[in-house]
Amino acid sequence: MKRTIAIVAGGDSSEHDVSLRSAQGIKSFLKETEYVTYIVEIKGTKWEAHTGNGLRAKVDLNDFSFIDNGTKVKPDYAYITIHGTPGENGILEGYFDLIKLPYSTSDVLVEAMTFNKFALNQFLSAQGVNIAKSVLLRKGQAARPTDKDIINTVGLPCFVKPNAGGSSFGVTKVKHAEDLDTAIDKAMAESPEVIIE
């Protein structure tokens, strides 16, 4: 009997479409003789299984099932291809743990820790791992360090990126001090926290 694999894609970040392309690639690699595969697209609270011929079915979040051609489908495994939230920060993994569905990524704690770049750096530093000096900025922060203080801490060139997010959007390599504010604004458009390293 073939196992049913849900290739979970989309997500809530700017990398939604990139994730869908990744899912298509994975689907093409899985042998149809061994697996029944569905792409399950997530965008906010809208979860839909692509059931073929452009049709989609709403996913029942009670058990991650959906109806395909009159038959209830409950995947045996979730292959997570979401770039960013909720696939790389532990949220989706926590849901799958609750419904006891095996999945392809690390567990909740590892995903949550590694998704937050600043928290991971602090953890690794405490373990004796050398890490780059960094500054964390938060949207609406009352007392933000000056550009001069940031550059004195991390040096130039530096990288400005969303603290919790992928590595494709909102990332800038800053070579000149006058470009720092623009880079921070770009990263803040992707995440309420920005890390500068």
List where the protein language model places each region.
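Active-site nucleotide/adenylate-binding loops and adjacent lid/helix of ATP-dependent enzymes
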Residues: 3-9, 13, 21, 113-197
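ATP-binding N-terminal substructure of ATP-dependent carboxylate-amine bond-forming enzymes
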Residues: 1-109, 113-115, 119, 138-146
